[in-house]
Amino acid sequence: MKKAVVLLSGGMDSAVVTAIAQSQGFMVHALSIRYGQRHTSELDAAVRIARVLNVAAHKVVDVDLRSIGGSALTDDIEIPDAGGKGIPVTYVPARNTIMLSLALGWAEVIGAADIFCGVNAVDYSGYPDCRPQFITAFETLANLATKVGVEGTQLHVHAPLQFLSKAEIVHEGVLHGVDFGLTVSCYRADVDGRACGRCDACKLRAAGFADAGVADPTRYMELPCSLLLL
């Protein structure tokens, strides 16, 4: 069976991508990164998802990006309730580049030619490393900068959700049997995985379920506006 490395954060998008990779016949090696994120319950969710989906392997790698800083997700910077203009303070400098690089390294070691990630360029917060151009550029890098690439193996970086709305992602998850109750998306999630209901991630998630007409299993400490209007 062909192998793939899948970046599994513990959020809903990465859970759906993991299920998609499995449905395509890949033996999934899930990779989660402990980068110093304040919402550590997301990693607990990744462990649960990997176990329930019965992935072939699950590795958690420590890369402490707090030493670099520059993000509200790692530093003592207030996480805003609403997104503003430009790139938000929740952007983590070079995060997706670093994570994909680690996935690339593991893929080369285990003999996998495919990497999956859950980046999205439709209903997203404006992160530059979620754009299709970035995924295309990284795939080019992967084939230029690896032993297997130079020796002729074509490496592929898959982002199957990049052109889907959050509602469409919810439908994909339902189609593939994903238990969204296992996932954590909130930037301010508490240690038990309860979501704040106010941050941009919570609002996007809640709106996705509402637009999809699917019950939202998220445990919110405060109901997002999109749910209060229903």
From Swiss-Prot:
Known Pfam families for this protein?
QueC
Catalytic activity field: 7-carboxy-7-deazaguanine + NH4(+) + ATP = 7-cyano-7-deazaguanine + ADP + phosphate + H2O + H(+)
- Keyword terms of this UniProt record: ATP-binding, Ligase, Metal-binding, Nucleotide-binding, Queuosine biosynthesis, Zinc
Q: What is its EC number?
A: 6.3.4.20
Sites binding Zn(2+) sit at 186, 196, 199, 202
What GO MF terms are annotated?
ATP binding; ligase activity, forming carbon-nitrogen bonds; zinc ion binding
GO BP terms: namely:
queuosine biosynthetic process
Q: Which residues participate in ATP binding? A: 8-18
Q: What class of enzyme is it?
A: ligase
**What are its cofactors?**
Zn(2+)
Keyword hit for ATP-binding: yes
Q: In which pathway does it act?
A: Purine metabolism; 7-cyano-7-deazaguanine biosynthesis
Q: Sorted alphabetically, which InterPro entries does this protein's record hold?
A: QueC, Rossmann-like_a/b/a_fold
- Note on how the cofactor is bound: Binds 1 zinc ion per subunit.
Give the protein's function.
Catalyzes the ATP-dependent conversion of 7-carboxy-7-deazaguanine (CDG) to 7-cyano-7-deazaguanine (preQ(0)).
Family, similarity comment: Belongs to the QueC family.
Q: What is this protein called?
A: 7-cyano-7-deazaguanine synthase
- This protein's gene is called queC
